[in-house]
Amino acid sequence: MKKKFLAFAFIVVGTLTVGTYAQRNVTPAIDRDPLMEADAKHNLDVAWQSYSLKKAYKGVLSRFEETYAAYPEFSKIDEFLYLAGVSSYLLSENKGKQKVDLKLEKEKDKFTPAKLRENAVAYLSRLVDKYPESKYKDEARKTLALLKDEK
């Protein structure tokens, strides 16, 4: 009787263990640093304000580069890639309130129209390729099409 009870107990425990094993999270969640995430979120908010309210596209690019260099795993990096790509495109068209001064050495290397278009294609292509679920993907494709038509 004891042997049957022990065998039954092992079967029950084994069955329950297999069920919980099957339910475990197969893809581990990305461990995000809360301080870095908060800082990156702040930079994203400032970039949105610079983009939409001030039309300060150089400021958007500055915030993006700072954030991407420090924290490329940011949970909303797709949004930042979109902002950086569109800002690069608009700057290459000489739009916005911050104008590019190609007489300055610092801006000459970084903000030539060809370099800005190249960066816009890189940022937007990365968004489309790496983040297919992003809500910015369709707008990124439209801007990429505009960039390819201009070549």
Predicted region positions:
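Acidic, polar-rich low-complexity tracts and alpha-helical solenoid repeat scaffolds
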Residues: 2-8, 18-151
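Repetitive helical segments and hydrophobic/amphipathic motifs
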Residues: 11-13
